[in-house]
Amino acid sequence: MFDILMYLFENYVHSEVELLVDEDELTKELTRAGFHQSEILKALTWLERLAELQEGDKPYLCNHDQHSFRIYTKEEMEKLDVECRGFLLFLEQVKVLNVETREMVIDRVMELDEPALILEDLKWVILMVLFNAPGHESAYEQMEDLIFEQPEEGRLHS
């Protein structure tokens, strides 16, 4: 399923090509690209649920304390290793993510059928969430820079 999400993001969203609106046409396109029907349906459901998160009726998106500390569940820790959780904390500290977008990311990560996520895949999920979160254009651009601008070899600081 994650491969399909990446395919859609790279070929439609990130390339600024208009995403096909008709789900049947999109399914046919993905089938022609070599993806299986069951995985296509999972990916489309994942995207629909991402869009639903923007409605803000999830309890974790309301009435939060900006200074609270996130405690991960056992299942979340199995899917997000220490490196991934540390990266989420880093993104909050540098204001790329806030409490709401962090929770959206965790929600979407937990919906993936991967047993565990590597940091590179987490970065793409974060990018997808920020792209779909109105009012977070600056955070999206910062995240995009973190993904695409690799530091020069042997150079840690500017």
Curated annotation (Swiss-Prot):
Superkingdom field: Bacteria
Entry-linked InterPro entries: Smg (IPR007456)
Family membership: Belongs to the Smg family.
Protein name: Protein Smg homolog
